[in-house]
Design a protein with these regions (language model features):
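Short, charged/polar micro-motifs that form catalytic or ligand-binding hotspots
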Residues: 27-31, 60-65, 95-96, 154-158
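Mid-core helix/loop region of P-loop NTP-binding domains shared across ATPases and GTPases
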Residues: 2-6, 10-14, 18, 23, ...
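Walker A/P-loop nucleotide-binding motif
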Residues: 53-75
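Conserved catalytic segments around the Walker B and adjacent sensor/switch elements
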Residues: 56-58, 81-98
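Active-site catalytic microenvironments for nucleophilic, acid-base chemistry
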Residues: 77, 81, 112
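Dynamic helix-loop-helix/coil hinge segments at AAA+ ATPase domain boundaries and subdomain interfaces
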Residues: 20-39
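Pre-Walker A adenine-sensing motif
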Residues: 39-50
Length: 235
């Protein structure tokens, strides 16, 4: 009887150094061809490191243009610098295609803010205003600056209207020690046309448009990924 069926494959040399380099969720240490967009985010969000409120932002662009990965990269660097400086900076990323109701968004934020001894906020059952009050209370307790990222925010608005955006952009009038900024990410360049003007003016204080990558840029990016993930000499 032959041995384990996996042994032959396990004994072969792999072509890969790190398969994660080809994963859609991979976050590289460098973002080629997005230097301008990174700089625009940094120039706004640096206020958080001084305890001030960054402007709310909207990031636009077609799917695959780097909006989410750029935002994650910048916020990771922001949190790292905040720790180094002793400045509290909390970030929350919510994909509004999966978390697509007002209740679920605020419940997710409240849960991420929970500390030992806090009552859990249920997935359903509480009035939404009560959950929002919990968010305000917990943000104020933590203090510092809180940055909420609403990825695919257009999906949330298309499904449930802009009431949540109005509530979130009003948080700073309710917070005690904490401060809050919103980053909306949308695939729809005309997204704000569907918003109440009051919401649009609050949310769209600074806009960044991510243009699609051109062929040579895609080639450069794939080349970098290949050098990170595939053994030298394979290609």
């Amino acid at each position: 009887m032959r041995g384990n069926i996996f042994e032959e494959i396990l004994g072969q040399d792999s072509l890969f150094v790190d398969r994660r380099a080809f994963d859609h969720a991979f976050e590289p240490a460098r973002l080629p061809h997005r230097e301008h967009e990174v700089d625009s985010l940094v120039r706004n969000l640096v206020d958080a490191l001084n305890g001030h409120i960054p402007s709310n932002m909207l990031l636009y662009g077609v799917p695959g243009s780097g909006k989410t990965v750029v935002t994650r990269f910048v916020l990771s660097q922001l949190r790292e610098k905040g720790l180094e400086m002793g400045q509290t900076v909390k970030t929350y990323e919510i994909n509004c295609r999966n978390v697509d109701t007002k209740y679920r968004v605020v419940q997710t934020i409240a849960t991420q803010l929970a500390q030992r001894g806090d009552a859990p906020v249920p997935f359903t059952g509480w009035p939404t205003d009560r959950v929002l009050e919990t968010v305000v209370s917990r943000m104020s307790r933590v203090g510092g600056v809180h940055i909420i990222v609403l990825d695919e925010v257009d999906n949330l608005v298309n499904k449930g209207g802009d009431d949540l955006l109005y509530a979130l952009t009003s948080l700073n009038t309710l917070l005690g020690d904490g401060r809050c900024s919103i980053i909306g990410i949308s695939n729809d360049l005309h997204f704000t046309q569907h918003l109440d003007p009051r919401v649009s003016s609050r949310l769209s204080q600074e806009d960044i448009v991510f243009h699609p990558y051109v062929a040579t840029e895609i080639q450069n990016i794939l080349g970098e990924r290949a050098s990170m993930g595939i053994k030298e000499g394979v290609l």
